[in-house]
Amino acid sequence: MLHDLPTHLQAGVRVLHSLPPTAPDPIAALGTAPARVVYLSTTAVYGSATQVDSSTPVDEQSGRARPRLAVERSIAAGPWSSLILRPAAIYGPGRGVQESLPRGAYHAGDNYVSRIHVDDLATHAEAALLSDLEGVYPVADEEPCTTREIAEFCARLLNLPNVPQPAPGTQPRTTSNRRVDGSAIRRALGIALLYPSYRTGIPVSLKFGAQ
């Protein structure tokens, strides 16, 4: 996949970078052509922080954070304007608790997780590319919840009698306990969420995922 990326772009283009960290980072091959780069990073860079907003420091010691932070800093130091977005857990049609729960691939607990619907993330990304805003911002919807709460919600939508137990040998995808406030970037870009909560986003995701 990476070898298919363009290495020569017309001057002045605006680039959305959402690839996971690689060495060397593919953005380095673009030279000075881009006028702007928007990078989709992750809230994992905040490590064990339980309350996150645009002023929360990153965790430099986190093994998951270091590769992402290296890419963030490389982009921020480039000869272009840049904006770093750090999305919370991304869900949508074919992706999310509503998909993993019936397979027994979801661990319900009392840890908090913030989320963002893929359509809302796309709105953020488009607005970010078209703006001149710079800096670093977390991205999330308005309703963090525990992994148990969302599992129970999905179980009701799917007409499951109860939350299925995880399949033997499966491991929780995340053990983080993090509530993310994404209001600062929405204000800065002047955008509103289509799905302010998983309560509205997951039913729509199930509808479109079944098509």
Regions found by a protein language model. Give the residues of each.
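Mid/C-terminal beta-alpha module of Rossmann-like enzyme folds, strongest
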Residues: 122-176
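C-terminal amphipathic/interface module of NAD(P)-dependent oxidoreductases
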Residues: 173-211
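Conserved Rossmann-fold NAD(P)-dependent oxidoreductase catalytic core, especially the SDR/UDP-sugar
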Residues: 27-63
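NAD(P)-cofactor binding segment of oxidoreductase domains
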Residues: 4-42, 70-73
